[in-house]
Amino acid sequence: MNEAKINQVALPAADVLKHQPLVLNYSQGLGRCLGLYLGQSILFLITCTSVLSVFLIFFFIIKEALPFLREFSPAEFFTNTGWYPQAEKPQFGALALIVGSIYVTVTAMIFAVPAGIFAAVFLSDVVSFKVQSVVKPVIELLAAIPSVAYGFFAVMVLAPWMQHRLGFTTGVNALNAAIILSVMSLPTIISVSQDAISAVGRELRESSYALGATRMETIFKVIIPAAHSGIIAAIILGMMRAVGETMVVWMASGNASRIPHPWWDLSLSIRTMTATIAGDMGETAKGSEHYRALFAIGLLLLVITLCLNLLSEYFLSRTAKKTGALK
Amino acid sequence: MKITTRSHFDKIFTAVTWLTVLVIITLLIMILGPILSKGTSAVIFRDTVEFRKMQITLFRRGNEMKLSAEKKQTAAVRQKIYDTIDDFKKGIDTQSLTEQVRTIYRRCGQELRRKDLTPQQYTDIRSTLKDIRDRLEIAFASKDKAEIAECVTYVMKFSGDENFKGTSAEDFFVIAADFQKAAKKTDLTKQHLYAESVGQIEDLLTLLLGPRPGAALPATAMNQFGATRWDLAQSILDKILWKEQWVSQGDGLPLVKTRTQRAEEFAGTEIEPLFGYIKDNLKTMMKPKLRFYWQYLIDDSTPGHYFGGIGPEIIGTLLLTLLSMLFVIPLGIISAAYLTEFASDNFIIKIIRVCINSLAGVPSIIFGLFGLAFFVLFLLPAFGAASKPCIFTASLTLSILALPVMIRASEEAIKTVPSTYKEASLALGAGKFRTFISVTLPAAMPGILTGVILSLSRVAGETAPILFTGAIALGPVPSSIFQSTRTLSYGSYDMAVGDRLAMMVPHNQYGMVATLIILVLCLNAIAIVLRTRLFKKLHGH
């Protein structure tokens, strides 16, 4: 009797065991569920490190810059060209530095954008896959070289060459920095715009060829207009690289804080925001006005690059939508 | 437009794209070429006997027996140069000759007092000595050969005098004879120029051969040895043979560099053949040998990197990168895993992605500022440590910089794992976590490794973030992670811009940058190989 009872009870239990993956009892399901949630939330928290980092970067840069922003009028910061932090009556006018940054960046882009787009077209539309697979890693090498090595080249090779061959009064000048910056931003521009150009489908190309257009016409009238937002994103990303670059401009731009006069004279020395931070920070006392002013420049730089970044993301998402729609 | 013009345009366009890419590749070669080729000369070069001396003195390395034999051989050849110059100087360096004569006169006076002489004899000899001294001084100051001859003959009259036998006064006659001999040969009006030029030659010889045997050893290591490299020796030889001058062409015109042969300047003197002698015997004096100085990569250096290698810099760079990898690898892989495998596509995830992209776009100098403000000035004091830049803070700063690189690469790697793998695992009853850990992660491992190596190479090359958070240009090898360190990247900067001494050793300047570039490029090459292998494996080609 007892045995039969046990059998009767045991039988359904064995049945349950068979189907265990499918039918869980309440506590088992809860445990697993909780485990999964707990695990996922831990993973989520760890993933949030990047968010935390961005937040902390903003917080600490603003925290250090705030006393300066309170004391000095932003109007003076943006309009005064005198950067004399060590003077008896210190002046913190960042205009010359901002202009310097824009100056080298724009000059670098004048060199880099056409070259980058031509190279991207070359990789996607002109050569065979085989040549492309050789050339692409070579161009990627340019991105791998550390910035200090570029700076070294600018100071040790390019600057003496400019001074002796081109007859400039100094080899470390805006042109030198701009040339190196354009080389440095080329890989970014090439790879992003190549992606955008390749993402324009075969259909568009083939219809254009079918209508009798040559390759040049197809590229200029069909493909580049179709890929324009990706190319704009590429240019913005390249600009970000150039604006944020420190070592090259510090070493190659000459570090003279002034607005070039005449404005087109590239052989003059200039000074950028990044170079000012790198150059001055080592010599300032922590917590001094000068120190805070450097953080204010850093904040400005951070805001500029963040805006550029959001802009590039907007353009990239537009390409993604467009190519998605085409498919 | 005609169809032919259109096709011409098309061809021109194709040519332009080719040209652009060729220009870019040429630029790459132009940048890497000189750096790498000159950098290699820090390791492979022709050394000289001075290099071997330096190696034994500073690093206790090399064969001392062999070296002392070599020293003997070279010393004999070198001595002849020193002797010639000393001889020549006897006729030129009137200032020191005058001094010498005065010293001898004083000494003679002392000797005279000790002698047993009558007052009359004493005054006689004394006045003769004074006469000799004055005559010699006149001779030294004179530019007229006849006058010199007259003075010297007058002095030499006394050379046979019994009173001067065995006294210091004999030195007068030696000097007088030497001077007359030298004065006969030299153009006396040029004495002044000669003295200056000989001084320059002596300085150059010290650079070439090191301090003179017997002279006091200079305090700094860089002055204790001559030219340690054959190329350096040759460039110094060139400076010895040719005199470079900036000559003005007239008012308002730029100065022009001219080169004149020093041998011409010294034409007719006994120094003239010396230049040929140095040129012919440079090899016997320096004994160049091809050397593979691999210890460059482990040696410490003397201040300013004048001698020695870049060992501490390499160790510092490795320490920084490996320590930052310790933070980045787990964070990066977990973030990537969460974003690809577990997260649903909602608003918060979008924010996270925007943040990661923003982090990737932050300029490297901002990371430096942040590292200074947060890690150095806030975090360290918060934990009771001294608030100073160190390896720890530098590597934390670098790890934040490398985080987006790592996350993106790992995401790509995890995404490339075919979904069939995961589906098979899920179908076998494994949960999400188990599937990820035992199926997806191993399959994505090569890709993740690529990401690790890419972020390693990024971190190794960065300079701006560690400027204020832990890098120094000079200093001891760190003994703990709470000390600052030298690194390849900061060292490269410092040697290119900050250090005047480094300008004299271009091979070491280039050597450090070349090492950094080779390190980074090798890491990248490994990453590329891994990536292609993974691609082939997963796509079954």
Positions of predicted regions on the chain:
Chain B
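Membrane-topology segments of multi-pass transport proteins
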Residues: M1-V16, L36-Y306
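Membrane-interfacial helix termini and adjacent extracytoplasmic/periplasmic loops
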Residues: S37, K287-G308, A343, I348, ...
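Interhelical loop and adjacent transmembrane-helix boundary motif
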Residues: G304, I466-I517
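Transmembrane-helix boundary motif in ABC transporter permease subunits
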Residues: S324-I356, L369, L377, I528-K536
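Membrane-cytosol interface at the C-terminal ends of specific transmembrane alpha-helices
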Residues: Y338, F342, N346, S387-A427, ...
